[in-house]
Amino acid sequence: MTSSIKITDNSRELNGPVSREKLSSILNEIFNKDEPIPSSVELVLAQLNELSSKHKFIVNVTKLNANNVNTADFSVDSYIGSSWNDKSDGAFHYQIPLGSGQPDTKRILLVSVYWILL
């Protein structure tokens, strides 16, 4: 039995200070290094702050570990409510599969980036 995780992005458009492609590139580059997650979050925030001084950013990371991919059964639901301006504020959710030293182990990071225009 093979398990798979699918992340759906329900956002209609990415109206942030960075393109979807650029943000994906930043997240892949930083989180695929062998750094502790808190350090990686700080690096992402530093790059985002360089790209826009007009926004505040929040980065949330959820790490999923499956010790046995044949029996892993994940179900993760996450919801957020906001009272922000849909034209200038928003969120981006991204999945990053991580390499593993063991073939029967699956590790995935679920990364959410939120921004609010000042």
From Swiss-Prot:
Source species, domain of life: Eukaryota
Q: Tell me where it mainly resides.
A: cytoplasm
Q: Of which family is this protein a member?
A: Belongs to the TDA2 family.
Keywords for this entry? Cell projection, Cytoplasm
- GO CC, any one term: cytoplasm
Compartment list: Cytoplasm; Cell projection
Whether Cytoplasm counts among this entry's keywords is: yes
Source organism per entry reads Kluyveromyces lactis (strain ATCC 8585 / CBS 2359 / DSM 70799 / NBRC 1267 / NRRL Y-1140 / WM37)
Give the protein name, as stated in the record: Topoisomerase I damage affected protein 2
